[in-house]
Amino acid sequence: MSDSVILRSVKKFGEENHGFESDGSYNNEKKSRLQDKKKSDSVRIGFFQLFRFSSWTDIWLMCMGSLCACIHGIAQPGVLLIFGTMTDVFIDYDTELQELKIPGKACVNNTIVWINSSLNQNVTNGTRCGLLDIESEMIRFAGYYAGIGIAVLTTGYIQICFWGIAAAHQIQKMRKSYFRKIMRMGIGWVDCNSVGKLNTPFSVDFNKINDSSADQLAIFIQGMTSPIFGFLVGFSQWWKLTLVIISVSPLIGLGAAIIGLSVSKFTDYELKAYAKAGSVADEVISSMRTVAAFGGEKKEVERYEKNLVFAQRWGIRKGIVMGFFTGYMWCLIFFCYALAFWYGSKLVLEEGEYSPGALVQIFLSVIIGALNLGNASPCLEAFAAGRAAASSIFETIDRKPIIDCMSEDGYKLERIKGEIEFHNVTFHYPSRPEVKILNNLSMVIKPGEMTALVGPSGAGKSTALQLIHRFYGPTEGMVTVESHDIRSSHIQWLRNQIGIVEQEPVLFFHTIAEKIRYGREDATMEDLIQAAKEANAYNFIMDLPQQFDTLVGEGGGQMSGGQKQRVAIARALIRNPKILLLDMATSALDNESEAMVQEALSKTQHGHTIVSVAHRPATIRTADVIIGCEHGAAVERGTEEELLERKGVYFALVTLQSQRNQGDQEENEKDATEDDIPEKTFSRGNYQDSLRASLRQRSKSQLSYLAHEPPMAVEDHKSTHEEDRKDKDLPAQEDIEPASVRRIMKLNAPEWPYMLLGSMGAAVNGAVTPLYAFLFSQILGTFSLPDKEEQRSQINGICLLFVTLGCVSFFTQFLQGYTFAKSGELLTKRLRKFGFRAMLGQDIGWFDDLRNSPGALTTRLATDASQVQGATGSQIGMMVNSFTNVTVAMIIAFLFSWKLTLGIVCFFPFLALSGALQTKMLTGFASRDKQALEKAGQITSEALSNIRTVAGIGKERKFIETFEAELEKPYKMAIKKANVYGLCFGFSQCITFIANSASYRYGGYLISNEGLHFSYVFRVISAVVLSATALGRASSYTPSYAKAKISAARFFQLLDRQPPINVYSSAGEKWDNFQGKIDFVDCKFTYPSRPDIQVLNGLSVSMSPRQTLAFVGSSGCGKSTSIQLLERFYDPDHGKVMIDGHDSRKVNIQFLRSNIGIVSQEPVLFACSIKDNIKYGDNTQEIPMERIIAAAKKAQVHDFVMSLPEKYETNVGSQGSQLSRGEKQRIAIARAIVRDPKILLLDEATSALDTESEKTVQVALDKAREGRTCIVIAHRLSTIQNSDIIAVMSQGMVIEKGTHEELMVQKGAYYKLVTTGSPIS
């Protein structure tokens, strides 16, 4: 009798069941989602929250760095105390000289008196004289400057170095925490977030956070200390003037606040747009073969560019705000100059409260402080960008997982038998809450039995397995193991009891031994060998160059589908799990391998609970219990005989399969009656007997008649990845030479109008500083004039000039900010687009290189384009600004004292040496840092792209450990970089004070001995030293410049590479009457990444137009490789592939592929709507909806699509994750049908379908083949026997060919494969 579904009592464990309601439903997931939504709406990152990952050591480093930054900041207003005193000395000295020049005055007894005048004979003037030795005074002041310079060198080094080290440590911890949280968030959450979106922070956002919490912050603290100290000094001694000067500070603060808020908001929007673009890039590069096959390169570039446009808009808006308010603040500062000198001169000249030196000291203390506030705006931009970037990262880190795979909570049973029950389970995928997948599913899976779940695609079979594995939690109801709700279990313990093999196996980038050892880390070599033998993988592994130590590429991409599946099965078997889940586990195998693996699985059944999802009745018959599923519910249960009597879901499945195979069996019996093949029945015992008999027979005759299965085309495994890298033709990343500045500049050529305007603004802004020095020295000179009215007149005129400079600065600063933001964003967008386009234009062999994994390429794409701006865009504005500054300063300086100017210029080489050293060392750091982060990016991409496999085998911690180990390299480099940058920064700051020291000493000599006016000394020194300061400020961008040269070099390397197969080329032959005649002529081929392994060895086969050719052979014999040659993913090393008599190498690549449609065994769908996925079949035109529907109907997917709430607008999720495999395959078939190709390639196109769908789709494919040339790769006889030509392959060559009847008459390899009962391989 068939068993009815029995509901057992459930043992609930205390606090672990807090989510159960009175009705038994479990609503914790829903509540969590609501909490997450509320949280995400209110997340705002405060500035100090950026340092939440700091340790006590980091805090100490930041405190010491801040203390040194404060001391450094005090140095500037502190030196003004010396400067003010020195000014009074200069003015007193010049005043004395001016008075002594008056006829009738002389210095008598250190007092100026009138002489030789009858009226004023010997009348004293009261002015002291003869007491000042100006040269000695300047020696004293020079000593003060030198002492402060040495202090600045020390504090400058410490502030940059300590903050850099602390930031590096915190960023490292932040990266680790973010990756840990992603890995423990659960499958449901990852479904709702694309892999590209989750990966983007690793390459972009963390860099922005680092910029906001490392050297920029130290410089900001230094800059903020100057105004604070200056204001304190001013208020303590000269409050009147200080109060007037500081009155404009609130307006400056308002501008700074607006900049901070606006930039933060715009940066957040910009980052989100880039994250979407990164998601597109990751998806496309991960699916490169599908994109190439359907000619989607241009379409994908356009899709990528659309997201870049949004980012560009926000970036330009950010530049407008920055330019406007930077100009606004400079305008206020110059207005403040005018006000301060006008009012200050009144206090000096009319009221006599202050000396000129005091006026200068107050003024410069406050104004330099205000200037530092203005210069802090780039830091504010970095802080705002860092906060915006941290917002989404911290939101993820703080999010509470619905299913925490690393939680230590939950029960662990000492013994487990494997009893599983579903209690009224209803389930919706988190990303598609409106679609009910399971609908009150109730079923019991008894321990030690093999239970098969059968039913049409989309019935919820695979979903049920995912609930057992606790990838998701049920929306309602519960799943129990040993009568315990699995939501109360320890997740890792539960998953360790489960082994899983899926239809589309995922193998990570390791040796085969390590791939299998992922199942159990403590497995010995003997365990690995035993598991490989049980999975029928041992023989092909031993044929590999390095056997179990062979490296087979990312995802196992260098193995055939069947070989990958067998390794995945070995990985599951080595766990020796109590519960084994088989989700279409053998669908990718040829019949030969499937039979052997099925027997191996049947041997492991003892003591294990096996739950199998399969479509083939031959696979299902070995089950003890069969459960029929339909519409998300279990509708029948029983043994095979019972379900056949019931005539329900299973009966319909078997009937369809039987009808399909009946013709096959009759044909075989007719052709081979002498072999007396017993007719197969539905009896489980008979099936197993015949299976074992066929296996025994195969051991005698199998493909030993054929040549021995060739070694699988894989590359030799090297002891390390570095050794493997040496074997590549491309240079290692560390060998890339920095790009030339000239070529980098050419990148911005299309934006020359913007850059011209911006450069004009920058030139004016650069001239402002030396003009300020000129006006400032002019004002000082007026205080030594004897005529008070003349003093007042000149000061008023100079104040008006300051107002004029303010107005000009407002306009030019805005012009510079806007135009360079515009040109920079256009450059970034174009570079990203060109880089992405160049990547998609590479040949498929290029993507086989381990350095060009999807993770590495998306990381490179995201960072390189933005970092190139470090040598172009706004950096050009900085260079023009600095160049103009120096040029105008030199002109002024040489006009007034060429000797003093030359003395100061002697210090310029020291500044240049500092910048050159910094550039050279940081360039090396940038290259190595990029390489190390790309390796980490490969790990994150591999883990997140295959999160189901990672979770299924419980290796989250292993990936986390590997990722964290890779982070050690960039961390150590960041420590070295902090020391180098700190030393260079301290030196560049110190040299200004040393230059001042020497200049004033020499200036005193020139005043004393050559009569140089003191105002000229001020004018020359101020102009030259301020211009040198501008150069020093420009050198602070050296790290960005160093990174830019490396990033640009990498871009040029990509853009300059000429792929052997250029998809964008318009060259090549085209013809109107494309027939579809195909000839493989003595084709020999080795994959570019493994040239030592021969995959095709003289493949020769021809087919006429509208014929069907079927390739038959063992896994790894080159069947799929031949299809890739036809698609021109690769070209043969020897021989030709002829299309209508044209050598494929000479045919236009776009024209060729536009006439070919392909349906692969593992369908790749994109994260867009079903409609867009089907439209992807023909990217040359806009496909009307009628054609899409017609193609869907032919592929038997239309009814399913119409049952969805959003119908054809339904998003299929990342890689089609929201659909069953059968649904994905049918959409892929519809995509091929809508292409209407002349040549149709079917690579196991129906292997993933249930019998009912397979029959209908096979009919559709048969119709689609009419009038077309078709190449079929299949393992099932029914799929290939009606082919016009059947080619049996082995060792990369065709060993026999003909029709089914001809090959049966020949009684060769094909005949024996059919007649012995041994499946076709």
From Swiss-Prot:
Specify the domain of life of the species encoding this protein: Eukaryota
Sequence intervals crossing the membrane: 63-83, 148-168, 216-236, 241-261, 320-340, 354-374, 756-776, 795-815, 870-890, 891-911, 980-1000, 1012-1032
Q: What positions does the record give for glycosylation?
A: 109, 116, 122, 125
> Which residues of the sequence carry a binding annotation for ATP 1?
455-462
Q: In which tissues is it expressed?
A: Expressed predominantly, if not exclusively in the liver, where it was further localized to the canalicular microvilli and to subcanalicular vesicles of the hepatocytes by in situ.
Q: Where is the composition biased (Acidic residues)?
A: 664-677
Query: Which CDD domains does the record cross-reference, listed alphabetically?
Result: ABC_6TM_Pgp_ABCB1_D1_like (cd18577), ABC_6TM_Pgp_ABCB1_D2_like (cd18578), ABC_MTABC3_MDL1_MDL2 (cd03249)
Q: Where along the chain is composition biased (Basic and acidic residues)?
A: 714-731
Question: Membrane topology per the record?
Answer: Multi-pass membrane protein
Q: Where is this region: Disordered?
A: 659-735
Q: Which reaction does it catalyse?
A: cholate(in) + ATP + H2O = cholate(out) + ADP + phosphate + H(+); taurocholate(in) + ATP + H2O = taurocholate(out) + ADP + phosphate + H(+); glycocholate(in) + ATP + H2O = glycocholate(out) + ADP + phosphate + H(+); glycochenodeoxycholate(in) + ATP + H2O = glycochenodeoxycholate(out) + ADP + phosphate + H(+)
- According to the UniProt record, where is the region Interaction with HAX1? 651-672
Where does it live in the cell?
Apical cell membrane; Recycling endosome membrane; Endosome; Cell membrane
How is the protein altered post-translationally, as described in the entry?
A: N-glycosylated.
Show which residues sit on the Cytoplasmic side of the membrane.
Answer: 1-62, 169-215, 262-319, 375-755, 816-869, 912-979, 1033-1321
Pfam families in alphabetical order: ABC_membrane, ABC_tran
For the modification Phosphoserine, the affected residues are 587, 690, 701, 704, 1214, 1321
**EC supergroup of this enzyme:** translocase
Q: Which residues lie on this side of the membrane: Extracellular?
A: 84-147, 237-240, 341-353, 777-794, 1001-1011
Q: Per UniProt, what is one GO molecular function of this protein?
A: bile acid transmembrane transporter activity
Can you quote the domain comment?
A: Multifunctional polypeptide with two homologous halves, each containing a hydrophobic membrane-anchoring domain and an ATP binding cassette (ABC) domain.
The task this protein performs is described as:
Catalyzes the transport of the major hydrophobic bile salts, such as taurine and glycine-conjugated cholic acid across the canalicular membrane of hepatocytes in an ATP-dependent manner, therefore participates in hepatic bile acid homeostasis and consequently to lipid homeostasis through regulation of biliary lipid secretion in a bile salts dependent manner. Transports taurine-conjugated bile salts more rapidly than glycine-conjugated bile salts.
Question: Under what name is this protein listed?
Answer: Bile salt export pump
Organism of origin is Oryctolagus cuniculus (Rabbit)
- Lineage from the top down? Eukaryota, Metazoa, Chordata, Craniata, Vertebrata
